[in-house]
Amino acid sequence: MIEQTRDITTAAGEMETFICCPERGGPFPPVFLLMDAPGIREELRDMARRLGTVGYYVLLPNLYYRAGRDTMFGPNVLEEGSAERERMRVVRTKMTIPPIMDDLAAMLAFTDGRAR
């Protein structure tokens, strides 16, 4: 299995993206695995790996990249009233559908341009 982190160029900057796929064979159909509110974490990387092992080219983008590279939250991010939850809420509320659609268009362009 190939695992790598690549920057995908978007209209807003470089979007850090975890990518995995099988080492041999192909072509591999792309799968865009979008994070939920708590953001990128090992559980999502594991899901991407599982999809990669069965023949997909999986892209897991950090959709919070506009808030800073490697934007991550602590383990209590889902606990009501926690500081991490409030920090996540502030970042999340700045995300709207149009920029996310632009990010997806950039991901499509990236997958179209990759070696088959």
Feature-to-residue mapping (PLM):
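N-terminal cap/leader regions of alpha/beta-hydrolase-fold enzymes
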Residues: 1-116
